[in-house]
């Protein structure tokens, strides 16, 4: 085996051992046994929300263990693969090199998962997208972003629940709120917070002029009972109205949509995607609790910044540029990570951006 290959495999082994240590593989196996025991309890589904949490955690833990075990097997097989390849010739060696490069990428992706250790990182994510400057193009852009994140979730087998979609008059959306239901989806998607900028030839401009549009992405952790975010009913004004679809058309004959206004903070939440008013109210309350938790977290961060004499982080402003004309490129303005295939990115292939963002955030946190 070539010395460079041997050194590379040794480096990969060191990285994978670190991943195995951080994940605590033996503890992960113990946790899976515990969750399997809970899942086998016939009374589990008496509480459907808890049952869904247990089955989701079990599925995620099993997948995580399977991934790290597969990586270990592939790495342990590499010396034998190269030994056989050297007997077979250049083409087999090229195949072995390709497997080694693929393995390096997969171990790096697994390593990123170990960087999600924040207080709320393992929670489900609540994503809110709002169109910004750019008129109808901005509304269309907001809908494109919504599709991008939902496609990303679907490709990973994650559940998505859309709580609210406020459609614009001509095309696109004014705003949308949806949950991505998978362990660590908040920690992963939270690096997407900020302003996303699109440059393209406007499909809505008869003269075919170039248009710059903006949309804002907000990502919050889904609130759990342990967060103690209690909402006084007297502080919330409840309004009901009929759900509307694209172009403002009514999609329901009853007043099933719900708008909650939290009077002390002025936070307004709407939900219209459920079939009943009660379901919409429950979903809207979840979103309101998540927003109130974020208010609490911002206050705590402001106190810490004041103690450190720090002006706070501004990374959540304009963070990524998507250029479709006059050239094709998507570039993260914080990490400098870029790709030249916007169509793939807009179809949900954003793992490279997520991984580079998580690594960037870790470096920023260490520096501060």
From Swiss-Prot:
Q: Which SUPFAM superfamilies match?
A: Release factor
PTM info: Methylated by PrmC. Methylation increases the termination efficiency of RF2.
What GO terms are given for molecular function? Answer: translation release factor activity, codon specific
* Predominant cellular place of this UniProt entry's protein: cytoplasm
UniProt modified residues of type N5-methylglutamine: 249
InterPro entries recorded: PCRF, Pep_chain_release_fac_I, Pep_chain_release_fac_I_sf, PrfB
Q: Which family does it belong to?
A: Belongs to the prokaryotic/mitochondrial release factor family.
What is the official name of this protein in its record? Peptide chain release factor 2
């Amino acid at each position: 085996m070539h010395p460079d290959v041997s050194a590379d495999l040794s480096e990969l082994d060191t990285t994978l051992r670190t991943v195995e240590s951080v994940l605590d593989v033996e503890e992960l196996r113990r946790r899976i046994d515990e969750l399997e025991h809970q899942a086998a309890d016939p009374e589990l589904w008496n509480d459907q929300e808890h049952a869904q949490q247990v089955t989701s955690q079990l599925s995620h833990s099993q997948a995580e263990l399977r991934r790290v075990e597969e990586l270990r097997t592939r790495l342990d097989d590499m010396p034998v693969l190269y030994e056989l390849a050297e007997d077979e010739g250049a083409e087999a060696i090229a195949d072995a090199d390709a497997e080694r490069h693929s393995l390096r990428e997969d171990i790096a992706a697994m390593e990123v998962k170990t960087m999600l250790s924040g207080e709320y990182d393992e929670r489900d994510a609540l994503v809110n997208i709002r169109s910004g400057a750019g008129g109808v193009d901005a509304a269309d852009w907001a809908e494109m972003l919504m599709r991008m994140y939902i496609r990303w979730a679907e490709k990973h087998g994650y559940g998505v629940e859309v709580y609210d979609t406020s459609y614009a008059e001509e095309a696109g959306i004014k705003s949308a709120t949806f949950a991505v239901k998978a362990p660590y989806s908040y920690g992963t998607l939270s690096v997407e917070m900020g302003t996303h900028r699109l440059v393209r030839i406007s499909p809505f401009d008869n003269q075919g002029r170039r248009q710059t549009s903006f949309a804002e992405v907000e990502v919050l952790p889904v609130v759990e009972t342990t967060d103690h975010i209690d909402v006084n009913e007297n502080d919330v004004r409840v309004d009901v109205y009929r759900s509307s679809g694209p172009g403002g058309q009514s999609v329901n004959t009853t007043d099933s949509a719900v708008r909650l206004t939290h009077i002390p903070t002025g936070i307004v939440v709407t939900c219209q995607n459920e079939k009943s008013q009660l379901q919409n109210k429950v979903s809207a309350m979840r979103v309101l609790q998540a927003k109130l938790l974020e208010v609490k977290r911002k206050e705590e961060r402001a106190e810490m910044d004041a103690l450190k004499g720090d002006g706070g982080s501004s990374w959540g402003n304009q963070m990524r540029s998507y250029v479709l004309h006059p050239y094709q490129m998507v570039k993260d303005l914080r990490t400098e990570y870029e790709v030249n295939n916007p169509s793939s990115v807009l179809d949900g292939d954003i793992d490279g951006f997520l991984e580079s963002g998580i690594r960037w955030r870790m470096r920023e946190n260490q520096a501060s």
